[in-house]
Amino acid sequence: TGKTSLCNILAGVLGLTNTDAGKRFTEINVENGWTSYKDYVGYYNPLAKTYEKANTSVYDAMHMLSKESRESTNIPPYVFLLDEANLSPIEHYWSPFLRACDIFQEDGVTFSLGGTEKWHLPNRVRFLATVNFDHTTETLSHRFLDRSWVITLDPDFIDSDLERVNIAEEFASEYAFSSNRLFQ
């Protein structure tokens, strides 16, 4: 139905995919069987005394955001896309970030991959998710839905509006908006 494409177009229009200014958008392909954020970020290996990356782009983005939040209060927006988010129960693998929705946290959310280091995501981070409702996916709980904005797409969206989507993709490649302008 074009859910992922729309998220990518949105990120492009906001200037978050512009590699010249620094990419501020990461797509996470959710896998069946995830039970913790350590399944897609990484974890601390106490035997080797190192951090093991589960997904290099996610780990590096969250590490960069944590570093930025320690060094500055003027942090540009960042968007993570959870593609096919309900292939695993969101309440399990997304719990530290879902918890942040329960209370307004001006300074973001702090979590640990193990070890002694605490990681911090600033409040300028946003999460998008695409979901399907069929026999291959997990149902979404009321707890999750109460904290989410849901946009439902018509299954025939791409067939009926393909030309408009192509125009939007061309527009997105022009970087009509730059997140850097938010801080000027």
Q: Which residues fall in each region the model found?
A:
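Basic, amphipathic alpha-helical bundle interface domains used for macromolecular binding and assembly
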Residues: 183-184
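AAA+ P-loop NTPase catalytic core and its hallmark functional loops
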Residues: 1-177
